[in-house]
A protein has these predicted regions:
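Walker A/P-loop NTP-binding active-site region of P-loop NTPases
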Residues: 2-58
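Structural beta-sheet core signal
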Residues: 34-35, 93, 121-123
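Switch II (G3) loop of P-loop NTPases
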Residues: 63-81
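Conserved C-terminal guanine-recognition region of P-loop GTPase G domains, centered on the G4
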Residues: 102-125, 131-134
Length: 199
């Protein structure tokens, strides 16, 4: 299974989603997943074992592998990214509730669907009615790809700031109701991907 997480807009939480799915997919499938990123200064270095992480230099080709892999790609959609997106089984396009980010989200979808229509949207850091409003916005713009919500919580910040995996946070009982909801939502995304892997 080749999964690409990409957005043309920096700060869209693609690396956060990549790390969460990397942990959850391995836990659920009992299979090892690798991560390939074109971010030279990625935060993933301190979170993922060296043997499972490959950083791609600016002018280096992105390898297409047949193993279970998550591509964490960002920036302008050059020929390297385009080829990776084309060869992916699923392309996840994350965004956050913001007018500027949603505009970029639409642009990202238009770029990706030229070569791959197996798109999954993730709306991260939502509060209150954000998700319903964004769903309406997407429908008004003719976007019908599967869309998942991840509520605003400390789950992801605990991973990056405290070095606590989702599993470790569960073991330590660090979750409030908002965090538990976010975990349920992240699990739903992982379950959807696993279903696609089997289908």
């Amino acid at each position: 299974m080749k999964i690409t997480i990409w957005s043309s807009k920096g700060g869209s939480t693609k690396t956060h989603i990549a790390l969460c799915l990397w942990e959850l997919l391995q836990k659920k499938t009992k299979k090892q997943f690798g991560v390939i990123t074109n971010d030279v200064y990625t935060d993933l270095e301190s979170k993922i074992p060296h043997k499972q992480l490959l950083k791609i230099a600016v002018n280096e080709d992105i390898p297409i592998v047949n193993d279970n892999i998550i591509y964490d790609l960002g920036g302008y959609i050059d020929s390297r990214c385009l080829n990776t997106i084309k060869e992916s089984d699923i392309v996840i396009i994350p965004t956050i509730p913001s007018v500027i980010y949603l505009s970029s989200h639409l642009s990202s979808i238009k770029e990706v669907q030229k070569v791959n229509k197996n798109i999954v949207q993730v709306i991260n850091r939502t509060k209150k009615n954000d998700f319903n409003e964004i769903q309406q916005f997407l429908q008004q713009n003719g976007i019908k790809y599967p869309c998942f919500e991840v509520k605003e919580s400390k789950v992801i910040s605990n991973i990056f700031e405290k070095g606590l995996t989702i599993t470790k946070q569960l073991e330590n009982g660090l979750f409030n109701p908002y965090s538990k909801k976010a975990i349920e939502q992240l699990n739903s995304i992982a379950d959807f991907i696993i279903k696609e892997m089997k289908g």
